[in-house]
Amino acid sequence: MNSARPTIVESSTLAEPMNADVDGLLLFDAGCPFCRRSVRWFLARERRDSRVAIVGLETPLGERLGRHFGFDPSDGDSIRYLTAGRCHRDSEALWRLCERLDGSWGALARMQKVPRPLRDGIYRFVGRHRSRLAPSDDARLEGHPRWIDRLTQAHCRHLELPLSLAGEAPV
C-alpha cells in the first residue's frame, strides 16, 4: 500500500489570474489545512463556466465583508459563500458550492433536501474535528490564481455587492 499523500492536481484552466468575471466568492479559514485542502478539491472539480474567487476570512477583505454582512471573520467557524448579493454559511454555502461542481460531483448539491438542522449539525461536527482531518503541512493558498486581495468595482457588479466594498489592495 502506498503511504504517500494523494496530490490534488489543479486544472490548467485555473492558471490565469482572477479577472472581473467572478460569479461567486468563497471565504474560508486560510489558516486551516483541512479548509485549504477542501478549497483545492473544489477548484479542481469546479465546472468550466463557474468563476469562484477565494479569500481568507481573516484578511482585510474578509474582515470588510464580515462587517458588511454582520459576521465576525475571526470566528473561522464556517465558510461563507457570496453570490447574487447574498452571504451563505455552513451547509447552505456548501450545497450552493456543490451546484458548481462538474459532472456527477454536482449531485452533492442534493444535500439541500436534508433538513437544515441535520445538515448544519453534521457540518459543525466536521468543523469541530477538522484539525485531525488534514495534514498540517498543506500549502497555503494566498498565491493561488483564484485568490483575491481586493474587490474591484467589476467584482462588485458581478457579485451584486455595493460598489462601496471595492477598494485598494492592502499595503
Show where each model-derived region lies.
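Local sequence-structure signature of Cys/Sec-based thiol-disulfide redox active-site neighborhoods
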Residues: 13-48
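N-terminal leader/targeting and pre-domain segments
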Residues: 2-12
